[in-house]
């Protein structure tokens, strides 16, 4: 049997949790704060790579960029995890989360292209990824106006994971090659792999989108 004082304490804690949930804006929930942190990490990563490659600052800045990028990638997992287990899912979070992902990936790809790490034929892989993200974002926005939800598939999650791992290797760049000589090459191979996944998942989204568009025109 639970003592009275412990039972009273439990009830008070539960009521405080309910009150906090009611008074705290959903935009300030922990999952959304983690998403904000991911967006805030972007200028730090870009600044480190710019300072090292363009301004010729020390190579250790690349490791700082990699560390911040990894932390940003971890928040991509944690925000969804905490939103589910704490029941803090919100329309604002569902809107902002994919935007944060695309900003992070696009910014890093553009910086790596400017740095010369992504060059030659590998630029095509980067362009495939960027164009797909733009097109899918436009499709999602249009379908949202029709109140049609396009869920993220498991394959799309794998695509994002491969993208983030590829970019992590490429951010290490010359600094990584000094530790393991093939770091940049591994990053470029993973970039092509993510581009292939990107095209396939993009096709899935467009097939689902076109299906809804045809139904809308016929209805």
Question: Regions from the language model: what does each represent?
Answer:
Residues 2-219:
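Alpha-helical transmembrane bundles and membrane-interface segments of multipass inner-membrane proteins
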